[in-house]
Design a protein with these regions (language model features):
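ATP-binding pocket architecture of kinase catalytic cores
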Residues: 1-77, 339-342, 346-351, 356-361, ...
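Catalytic-loop of the protein kinase fold
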Residues: 124-126, 131, 388, 392-409
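Helix-rich C-terminal or lid/interface subdomains of diverse kinases
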Residues: 53, 57, 118, 161-241, ...
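An alpha-helical support segment within catalytic cores of ATP-dependent transferases
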Residues: 23, 57, 64-127, 178, ...
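ATP-binding glycine-rich loop module of kinase domains
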Residues: 1, 273-275, 281-323
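Conserved protein kinase catalytic/activation segment
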Residues: 134-143, 405-419
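Juxta-kinase regulatory segment immediately upstream of eukaryotic protein kinase catalytic domains
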Residues: 240-274
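Active-site Asp-x-Gly
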Residues: 122-124, 137-190, 420-447, 451-459
Length: 522
């Protein structure tokens, strides 16, 4: 194994590099370099879609490089070897007292596709290549670990453990396939992969029985999931697979787009250290740093992956947002520093605001935010109320305000509100049918074409925000973390009947403050 690790390391595979091997008492020791980082399996769901897919691409490309190491010429013919292995697994499955519902579909698929093994090449295999044997080091680079099950065989058989990758992150699994084949996946691959996964799945329950009923249940659920992916083994392309999206790197950071775009103009604002590319507005946002100062750049004009409409429409919407940030300048609103027609589009430049986002699209940040002490969340809500009251006084109605608009700086205790692009001046009428925004925070009138949108609409938004902050997004008394009076106040605000809500933000604030004075802190 040590020699094979040396060979892999010589190809530039990111891994624990072999340093030394020698005898130790009655055994053998090996010395390898240390990788300081996180298990990818543990953090993958906390990463953005872009990062998940990008790491999948990396994993596929690394595997392709690993497979450039040939198998020994003396290696047994693959067709004979793997047919023997499948026969053994089928026999063990039939002898096993526990069978899968629909398990015969795996056997039928194997028997109908054995011919695919004929003439398959053989190469060095990692032997256990999946997300559980990958790490992200402190520099953000993918690292491969645990080579102790290495083997030689069909390079495509190495994908048989992609089941575990797909269960954790379909985007990562898709990226792994696309990266390996450079985006051009041959149809034969899917047929063979289904064969290899069928073989692996058959052996899972016999393997699990010695480990107890809990492990057996895991394998039964996994088999059912595999059958659902492959439509009972009738479709060789699993349902989790995605062709992905175009990835472009800016200062070493990936972003997803519909196609290439020239972002060289960003260097006017320094080096990019963060990218936000999941907006459906058509905007793409960047954190940049120049001469020790940080900026938040919101840009319209690029072909963003999730954007609806054309880049030109996104530019027009962002241009409309410019006076909103100027008119609603407030101590808790992200500070606009300027705007510029640049790069074939429009950039709004803000001073950078540190903080964790409450939005559930950022799982790690969201969890940290929601673990804030009750007193801190109450302070955040006071800041939001202050901004909403100011918004109403300036003659605006808040459209598309949601948890993703709220940042909290754990160092300073400061609340920052951002992403108010769709706020509108009153009088305002619903001219879309379904207005921009998250349905969790939208009033009924924001779904009714021609309905009036006003301060009473924003009372609903404030009530929904209260339930997000103090009721775990639910609207039942059981989840509410404050007292009965404040619950009644918030419930009144989210009434479907506009006439039953508080009729102004000020009225809500006064009722809210009065309720808190009558309630003991938990």
């Amino acid at each position: 194994m040590f020699r094979m690790q040396q060979r892999a390391a010589s190809l530039g595979i990111p891994m624990c590099r072999p340093v030394e091997i020698g005898p130790c008492a009655d055994g053998v020791y090996t010395l390898q370099t240390w990788i300081d980082g996180d298990d990818l399996e543990e953090i993958i769901t906390e990463l953005s879609d872009t990062r998940q897919y990008a790491y999948g691409l990396d994993a596929g490309r690394i595997l392709r490089r690993l497979h450039s190491i040939p198998a020994p010429e003396s290696q047994e013919d693959w067709e004979s070897r793997f047919n023997r292995k499948m026969d053994y697994k089928i026999q063990k499955y039939r002898e096993c007292p526990i069978h899968y519902e629909g398990g015969q579909s795996f056997i039928d698929y194997i028997n109908a596709n054995r011919h695919l093994l004929r003439g398959r090449p053989q190469v060095f295999q990692h032997g256990d290549y999946h997300i559980g044997n990958m790490m992200i080091d402190r520099g953000g680079r993918l690292q491969i670990i645990d080579f102790d099950r290495y083997d030689f065989g069909d390079p495509w058989e190495e994908f048989n453990r992609i089941v575990w990758c797909a269960q954790k992150s379909p985007l990562f699994a898709s990226g792994m396939v696309n990266g390996y084949f450079d985006g051009d996946v041959p149809p034969e691959f899917w047929k063979l992969l289904a064969l290899y996964i069928s073989s692996n799945t058959l052996s899972s329950v016999p393997w699990a029985i010695p480990f107890g009923q809990g492990e057996v249940e895991v394998m039964l659920r996994q088999a059912a999931e595999v059958l659902s992916w492959y439509d009972g083994m009738r479709n060789p392309v699993p349902s989790w697979y995605s062709k992905g999206f175009y990835l472009q790197t800016i200062d070493g950071i990936p972003c997803k787009l519909k196609g290439p775009f020239d972002f060289s103009f960003l260097h006017e604002y320094g080096t990019v250290f963060q990218i936000f590319d999941d907006q459906d507005s058509g905007n793409i946002c960047f954190g940049t740093e120049r001469d020790g100062r940080r900026y938040f750049i919101k840009f319209a004009g690029a072909p963003t992956e999730r954007g609806t409409g054309t880049p030109a429409e996104a530019v027009a919407r962002l241009r409309t947002a410019l006076p909103v940030y100027r008119d609603l300048r407030h101590k808790n609103l992200i500070r606009l520093a300027g705007a510029k027609e640049i790069g074939g589009g429009l950039a709004l430049v803000f001073q950078w605001a540190d903080g964790d986002c409450m939005g559930r699209m950022y799982p790690a940040s969201h969890r940290r935010f929601m673990r804030l002490p009750l007193e801190a969340r109450l302070a955040v809500f006071r800041d939001i109320l202050s901004f909403f009251e100011y918004t109403a006084a300036q003659g605006y109605v808040a459209i598309d305000f949601y948890d993703g608009s709220i940042l909290y700086d754990f160092e300073t205790g400061r609340t920052t509100i951002c992403d108010i692009d769709f706020f509108r001046r009153q009088p305002c009428v619903n001219d879309m049918g379904r207005m921009w925004g998250s349905s969790r925070f939208q009033s009924p009138e924001e779904f009714q074409l021609g309905a009036v949108l006003d301060e009473v609409t924003n009372v609903y938004t404030i009530g929904a925000t209260a339930f997000a902050l103090f009721g775990e997004y639910g609207r039942t008394r059981d989840n509410w973390q404050l007292g009965d009076i404040s619950f009644t106040t918030a419930a009144k605000a989210v009434s479907d009947d506009r006439a039953r809500r508080q009729q102004s933000i000020r009225q809500f604030r006064e009722e809210w403050e009065a309720a808190l004075k009558q309630e003991p802190m938990n």
